[in-house]
From Swiss-Prot:
Compositional bias of kind Low complexity: 295-326
PANTHER family: HTH-TYPE TRANSCRIPTIONAL REGULATOR, LYSR FAMILY TRANSCRIPTIONAL REGULATOR
Pfam families tied to this protein: HTH_1
Name listed for the protein in its UniProt record: HTH-type transcriptional regulator BlaA
Keyword Cell cycle belongs to the record: no
GO molecular function: DNA-binding transcription factor activity; transcription cis-regulatory region binding
Record domain HTH lysR-type: where: 1-59
InterPro entries reported in the protein's UniProt record: Tscrpt_reg_HTH_LysR (IPR000847), WH-like_DNA-bd_sf (IPR036388), WH_DNA-bd_sf (IPR036390)
Primary role: Positive regulator of the expression of the gene (blaB) for beta-lactamase. It binds to the blaL-blaA intercistronic region.
Source organism (scientific name): Streptomyces cacaoi
């Protein structure tokens, strides 16, 4: 039986002294209120009301039970209020710090139109995984290799000066004998300090004979960008980031690099709900493409013609590069 609503009918009828008026106060019909009170009496094994007169009056047992019934109804009402508040509370989502404020704002706005309230929290790759594991967030966009990803973001190298080539070969950064320094560096932002990106670049660095210091992880994107703007260094980033920062972007000649992301949640229903309603908007916020990055064999980015120039602020028709500096 529904003890809470039976107690609600019992309390309202006792307060109003009438089954008809009490039922209306409890927002139920008189017949439903009568059945619920009768069911409660049967459950307790004692009568709650004396029905001998026209106005129902409490029996001694009913007077004893009324305070507890009131407490139960109050607690149930509080529980309902808490449930409504919890349903309307924003869903906290851990997202990469590389996402721009504008794109995250658009994501939050679009989610509201689809009956999901998001509270986005930016964090690095390891921290996002930990936030999901400890359930400090409801869901998170986690970094994975592109071949395991739902969304992929192509990566390349961007600099402050406009290059004359379609691709940047990491080998071209090696200082030749007698060549004046300093050596040009590749600046890696924290979002890309993961084995499937920084680890692959480190192996390439060693293979082509660069110095260890020529590949460095910056403490944040601001520091990395400042280093690039004040030197000939290059930033590992996506085409969208390069465009936002006013840098010239090219794919890496020797490697096809991409960030990969999956949506994870402590409760799978949360992940399914977000994927089902927000997948294209999450992809846009990440700067993701349907492909997994530019192809070093052609220099073309995802969705780009092999004959067109990829990347941000690019000039069409730039020449191919061998091992010349970018």
């Amino acid at each position: 039986m529904d003890v809470v609503n039976a107690c609600r009918a019992f309390v309202k009828v006792s307060e109003r002294g009438s089954f008809t008026v009490g039922a209306a106060a409890a927002q139920m019909s008189q017949s439903v209120a009568s059945r619920r009170v009768a069911a409660l009496e049967k459950h307790f094994g004692e009568r709650l009301f004396d029905r001998a007169s026209r106005r129902p009056s409490l029996t001694p047992f009913g007077r004893d039970m009324l305070p507890a019934a009131r407490r139960l109804v109050r607690v149930a009402d509080v529980l309902e209020d808490e449930a409504r508040a919890a349903r309307s509370r924003p869903m906290r989502l851990a997202v990469p710090a590389s996402c721009t404020t504008a794109e995250l704002a658009r994501l939050v706005a679009d989610s509201r139109e689809r009956d999901i309230r998001l509270d986005v929290r930016t964090a690095g790759p390891e921290q996002r995984a930990e936030l999901v594991r400890t359930q400090e967030v409801r869901a998170g966009l986690l970094a994975v290799p592109p071949d395991q990803a739902l969304w992929a973001v192509p990566l390349g190298l961007a600099g402050a000066d406009e290059p004359q080539t379609r691709r940047v070969f990491v080998e071209s950064l090696r200082l030749r004998r007698g060549e004046p320094g300093p050596a040009r560096c590749i600046r890696v932002q924290p979002e890309d300090d993961v084995p499937h990106i920084q680890g692959r670049l480190a192996r390439l660095r060693d293979a082509v004979g660069l110095r260890p210091a020529q590949l460095s992880v910056a403490p944040d994107l601001t520091s990395a960008t400042a280093d690039v703007l004040s030197s000939d260094d290059l930033l590992l980033c996506s085409p969208a980031q390069a465009a936002e920062l006013g840098l010239y972007w090219r794919p890496v000649g020797e490697l096809r690099l991409a960030r990969g992301y999956v949506l994870d949640a402590a409760v799978e229903a949360d992940a399914e709900r977000l994927r089902g309603r927000l997948a294209p908007y999450l992809a846009r916020a990440l700067g993701a493409t349907a492909d997994h990055g530019p192809d070093p064999a052609t220099g073309a980015g995802p969705g780009a013609d092999a004959g067109t120039e990829p990347g941000a602020r690019a000039e069409p028709g730039a020449p191919e590069e061998g091992a010349q500096a970018c």
